[in-house]
Amino acid sequence: MNSGNPCCDPVTCKPRRGEHCVSGPCCRNCKFLNAGTICKRARGDDMNDYCTGISPDCPRNPWKG
């Protein structure tokens, strides 16, 4: 089950003790990226998406239709 990911517990593939995350656009070096870090750049008339600082996921900005 070990994916070879250094953030991943080899048995459960959940974050190792003391680490925040295993993977995701807002996860780097096993830690969440700071709130306000751009995780998806805007295209056209869209707006940037930003990390929350508490999740490895990149949430959609609330203004997307």
Swiss-Prot record:
Listed Pfam families: Disintegrin
The keyword Disulfide bond is assigned to this record: yes
Molecular function terms, GO-annotated: toxin activity
Superkingdom of source: Eukaryota
Subcellular location: Secreted
Major place of residence: secreted
Record keyword Secreted present: yes
Disulfide linkage: C7-C30, C21-C27, C26-C51, C39-C58
Tissue specificity statement from the Swiss-Prot or TrEMBL entry: Expressed by the venom gland.
All residue ranges annotated as the Disintegrin domain in the record: 1-65
Record InterPro entries: Disintegrin_CS, Disintegrin_dom, Disintegrin_dom_sf
Sequence motif Cell attachment site, location on chain: 43-45
Keywords, in A-Z order: Cell adhesion impairing toxin, Disulfide bond, Hemostasis impairing toxin, Platelet aggregation inhibiting toxin, Secreted, Toxin
GO CC, one annotated term: extracellular region
Subunit text: Homodimer; disulfide-linked.
Function: Poor inhibitor of platelet aggregation. The disintegrin inhibits the adhesion of cells expressing the RGD-dependent integrin alpha-5/beta-1 (ITGA5/ITGB1) to immobilized fibronectin. Inhibition on alpha-2b/beta-3 (ITGA2B/ITGB3) is low.
Family note: Belongs to the disintegrin family. Dimeric disintegrin subfamily.
Additional notes on this entry: Does no inhibit alpha-1/beta-1 (ITGA1/ITGB1), alpha-2/beta-1 (ITGA2/ITGB1) and alpha-6/beta-1 (ITGA6/ITGB1).
Protein name: Disintegrin VLO4
Organism lineage: Eukaryota, Metazoa, Chordata, Craniata, Vertebrata
